[in-house]
Amino acid sequence: MAQQKKPTALAVMNDFQIVSRYDGMTPEDLEELKDQLEDLDQDTGIACRSIKIPSGGGTAYEVQGEDDDTDPMKTITGVVVFTHRLSGYWPNAYGSSNNPEDKLPTCASMDGKTGIVQKGDNTGEVITCKTCPWNQYGTARDQAGNQARGKACKNMRRLYILMDGDPNLYLLTVPPTSIKDVNNQLAKIAPYADKVVTLSLEKATNAGGTPYSKVVVKRTGVLPPAAAAVVSELHRQIKAQYQNMALTMDDYTAAPERGKAVDVTPDDAEWEAMNGGGDFQEAPPHAPQGPAL
């Protein structure tokens, strides 16, 4: 009789640093900074930098740095503080319009369950995603306008990530072609907010010979209790605000090569890879770590 393989215990990563840009500031300095920020009338919502997936099957993430420049990173090691699914329906193909308003979806859902029409005569109408005709397979259109096997409404997932020793919060939007794999990987590490993970990209090729990038999430270690408690509190704060983060076409599209539009409609091979049974998969809910705050 074959012996069952015992799960490998994850090492506690005591060297992983959860830092704040305000560490070391006196109460007086913090109060002065608060006054300065309020005077700048900053936008409400969650302040975070972007992580983009490259086009053309690239294997390095494009991570937003200082002054909006980007730094290529083959791997990203950090903590998934919060994650949620979201969906957006754009009737036009990417790059088919120069109107900035067309970046906004006609309908958007911040939980993948209930959508709200964003523009047009039916603005404000509430839509049930499961039964919406645009959220069914076979309703997608490719760049040429031909029917494709995917969904017209694009199912995605947002990951809010903290990196080691970095005070900035980062946002990665997982595209439809990586949804199934990422959901399965998150399920293996749940509850996820006390786990350190490493994200990478694998090059894949669709049936038409076009390369694309797939998101890979692997377990790396476990946070010590004190750091896990800090992440749990940050999770609570993001959960209270995440629905204020607008969904735009930038969430759905890859970082393009210069001068090239990106075909973001999954082809048959990609559709088969992400269609595990027809239903959108949800990762397990977050279980708070450390003491209740």
Q: Where do the language-model regions lie?
A:
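Aromatic-enriched hydrophobic runs in primary sequence
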Residues: 126-127, 210, 285, 291
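Glycine- and charge-rich intrinsically disordered segments
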Residues: 1-56, 224-293
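Extended aliphatic helical segments
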Residues: 12, 19, 63, 79-81, ...
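Generic alpha-helix signal with a bias toward terminal, lower-confidence helices
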Residues: 92, 141, 209-211, 229, ...
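Extended serine/threonine-enriched, polar tracts that run as long, contiguous segments within proteins
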Residues: 149-224
